[in-house]
Structure formats: C-alpha cells, structure tokens
Amino acid sequence: MQTHIINFAKYSSIKIGAPLEVSLIQTPQDAISALSQNMRIIGKANNLLVSPAAQKLAMLDKHFAYLKDCGNYIEIGGAYSSGRIFSYFKSHNLAGAEFLQALPGSLGGLVKMNAGMKSYEIKQLLQAINVNGKWQDRESFPMNYRDSGIEGVILAARFHKREGFNNALQADFIALRKNHPKEPSCGSCFKNPKGDFAGRLLESVGLKGYCIGDAAFSEKHANFLINKGKATFEDALSLITLAKKRVFEASGIDLECEVQILQ
C-alpha cells in the first residue's frame, strides 16, 4: 500500500496530534491487508484522539469518495463526506439525511459508529454495506447505539431512496448545532448511558468548563471535549480518565467513550 504523512494537529477535528504515516486503502485487497496487519482506520478523524506515538494507521483513498444514483438506491463510497451526502439528498428532494447537516465525517465513519442525532440514526437509511469488498444486508449487523458492530473496513453503502426532504427537520438540526462549541472538538466524548445523559453527569461532578492544560469540557455542552489552543494528547487523555473516575465514584455509572482513542 502507498503511504503518506498526515499531521493530526491539523487534520483531526480536535487539532491534537503529530505528523504520522498513514497507509492508503485503494482496493478491497488493500482493506483485507490492512485488517491482517491490525491497522486502524482514521476516516476524517472527527471523533478520534490520536496519540503522537500511534502506529498502523490507514485511510480510504479518494477512489472511495463517490456517490452514484443506481435507480432504486443511492450508492456512496466510504470516503464521501457527510456534508456532500446531505447536499445531494437536499438538492434531489430525498428524505432521511437531514440530520447530516449537523454531523461532520465520512460515510465510513458514520456507518461504523451508527452516527445520529436525537432519534435519527444512519442505520435508518441503510440498505446494504460493503465490508472488505463484500456486500451484506444492513440487517446482518447489530447497528446498536453508536456502534454498528461491523468488524472490517467499510468501503461503501447503499441508501434507501425515498422522496421528501424535510426542511423543517433540517432547521431543527441547525438549531441544535448552534448549541455546539466553536472550538476544535472531537464531538461527544462519552456515549449517553441508558436513561441519562453524559453531559448531565459530567456537569453534576463539576466538570463543565473544567480544564487540564488546554483540553477542556465545554462551557456550552459538558460532553464536548474541546481544544482551547494547545492541548496535548496527554491533556485530553488525563481529562477523560478523570471524568470517568469522578462520574463512577458519584453515581456508579461507568461512562463509555464515544471518542475513539488511538494509542
């Protein structure tokens, strides 16, 4: 596989990291090779915290940044961005992708974590998923809350094609997005535990706005891990560790990370 250098301090959404070698997946055979070498897929690094010492990283090449109308369904490559998916669905009056207005990332990452907002999740759009070069029905995978259960490299997906883009729903998601912090962020740091909210739990133990170095939990939304300027990987990891400890001691709830930590 070809490789190139990515500076995660510039590339990742939280702007933390260092220049690291990343392998390019250009074919299904490359995907299988990456798996055999235990490589981690970085996508657009929107929900990743990457150590300066991380190794065995890979990403989909631009060959997988495509979208095509196949008549009864839309096929989208794993490297295609959420913003472009949203724009296509809106301009072609297709329903279901309104929530992507507020979610950054690539198709592969969205499917991998079954991304969503409120009651809307990517699984509701999916017909089939191409994993390691093999198409499988969406029902083949668990597709749980923020975890698809997919083990492998997501090369593409097929979306149901339904008419009726909902402009009112888009407006709701735009309003939600306004409550998100403006600083570099990895998005939601922790998954919401059943029957509760991670942000509420973090706020209840005094961590809203709390900083270690330049890593902080946002004043706007406690579950957003942000970079106030020069945060390091160690700052962010220490803050996550502290948060899990405080919440567990106060409530007995073991918070599960939504951000993926690559060490």
Swiss-Prot record:
Transmembrane segments: none annotated. It holds the Pfam family MurB_C. Its cofactor is FAD. Pathway: Cell wall biogenesis; peptidoglycan biosynthesis. It catalyses: UDP-N-acetyl-alpha-D-muramate + NADP(+) = UDP-N-acetyl-3-O-(1-carboxyvinyl)-alpha-D-glucosamine + NADPH + H(+). GO terms for cellular component: cytosol. InterPro entries: FAD-bd_PCMH-like_sf (IPR036318), FAD-bd_PCMH_sub2 (IPR016169), MurB (IPR003170), MurB_C (IPR011601), MurB_C_sf (IPR036635). GO terms for molecular function: flavin adenine dinucleotide binding; UDP-N-acetylmuramate dehydrogenase activity. GO terms for biological process: cell division; cell wall organization; peptidoglycan biosynthetic process; regulation of cell shape. Its EC number is 1.3.1.98. It is an enzyme of class 1 (oxidoreductase). The active site is at R146, S188 (proton donor), E258. It is found in: Cytoplasm. Keywords: Cell cycle, Cell division, Cell shape, Cell wall biogenesis/degradation, Cytoplasm, FAD, Flavoprotein, NADP, Oxidoreductase, Peptidoglycan synthesis. Cell wall formation. NCBIfam families: murB (TIGR00179), PRK13904.1 (NF010479). PANTHER family: UDP-N-ACETYLENOLPYRUVOYLGLUCOSAMINE REDUCTASE. Belongs to the MurB family. HAMAP family: MurB. This is UDP-N-acetylenolpyruvoylglucosamine reductase. It comes from Helicobacter hepaticus (strain ATCC 51449 / 3B1). The gene is murB.
